[in-house]
Amino acid sequence: MKLAVYGKGGIGKSTTSCNISVALSKRGKKVLQIGCDPKHDSTFTLTGFLIPTIIDTLQSKDYHYEDVWPEDVIYKGYGGVDCVEAGGPPAGAGCGGYVVGETVKLLKELNAFDEYDIILFDVLGDVVCGGFAAPLNYADYCLIITDNGFDALFAANRIAASVREKARTHSLRLAGLVGNRTDKRDLIDKYIDCVPMPVLEVLPLIEDIRVSRVKGKTLFEMAEIDKDLAYVCDYYLNIADQLITRPEGVVPKESPDRELFSLLSDFYLNPKSKVGQEKVDQEELDLMIV
C-alpha cells in the first residue's frame, strides 16, 4: 500500500507521518517513508539527524544512476522504518517537484518499491503542482493533515481537488482527514458536512508532540522512557489500524473556493449565531429535564 500525506505547510505532517510509520511498523508492516520536501527533514524524528538526500547521493556519483545502491539512499530509522529523503535543488533554482519524480524513478530502478508493505510519501506543504502531485500518481490513498482552522481546511479543500483530478486516471482514494493540534473539531465538522470525507483521528494540542520534533524522536521512542506518553501513541496506532484495513476511502467533491471561503469565514465572523444556537440547545435541554 502506498500512502501520500499532504496538508498545509507547518501543520505537523512530518511529525505525524513519522509516528504513523512507526505505528504501522509496530503492527508488523515493513515501512518505507519518503520525504518529498527540499528541506529534507521529513525523517528527522525517525533517524535523529538529517540524512543525505537522493540529490546529495547522485551528485557524489556524478549522476551515474547505475552506481547507486539501495544502502546509499535508504537509512534505517527508529522502529525498523526505512527512510529516504528526496531533497531538492538549491533555493531559488530548479524544480523541487522534478526531484520527487526522479526519486521515485531511482527507487523503482533499485526495486525498492517491491520490498515494502507500506510506502509513505510525506509531501511538501500544500503545494500540489504537477511535480509535487507526483506521489498521487503512485499512491493508493491520500491522507490530509489539518487543524480546526480556516487556512488548513482551505488547503485541505485544494488537496481534495487534486485527489479528485488524479482519481480520474489512477486508482486513488482519499483515506480521510487527521486533525492535529486541536482541542476542538467544530470547524472540521462544518467542512466535512460540506465536503463529505472520513476523519480518521483528531489529536489534541499536546506539548510533548512539539517537543518530540525538537528532540528528533518519535512519541513511541519517548514513551519508552516516559510511560505516561503511551496514550499519545494510541492516537497513531488507531490511525494505523484503520489504514491497514484498506478503507474504502472517497473521491471527494471539493467545495468551490468562494463558497468555502464564505462558509468558513462565516464561522468566525458570526460567532453570535453559534452562541445563540448553544443557548437554544441549552433551553431545550432544560425543558427536557423538567
From Swiss-Prot:
Cofactor: [4Fe-4S] cluster
Residues annotated as binding ATP: 10-15, 39, 180-181
Gene Ontology molecular function terms on file: 4 iron, 4 sulfur cluster binding; ATP binding; metal ion binding; oxidoreductase activity, acting on iron-sulfur proteins as donors; oxidoreductase activity, acting on the CH-CH group of donors, iron-sulfur protein as acceptor
Subcellular location: Plastid, Chloroplast
Enzyme class, broadest EC rank: oxidoreductase
EC number: 1.3.7.7
Assembly mode: Homodimer. Protochlorophyllide reductase is composed of three subunits; ChlL, ChlN and ChlB.
Binding annotation for [4Fe-4S] cluster: 95, 129
A GO CC annotation given for this chain: chloroplast
The protein's name: Light-independent protochlorophyllide reductase iron-sulfur ATP-binding protein
Pathway, per record: Porphyrin-containing compound metabolism; chlorophyll biosynthesis (light-independent)
Predominant location category: plastid
Residues bound to Mg(2+): 14
Superkingdom as given in the UniProt entry: Eukaryota
Cofactor binding description: Binds 1 [4Fe-4S] cluster per dimer.
Keywords tagged on the record: 4Fe-4S, ATP-binding, Chlorophyll biosynthesis, Chloroplast, Iron, Iron-sulfur, Magnesium, Metal-binding, Nucleotide-binding, Oxidoreductase, Photosynthesis, Plastid
Membership in a protein family: Belongs to the NifH/BchL/ChlL family.
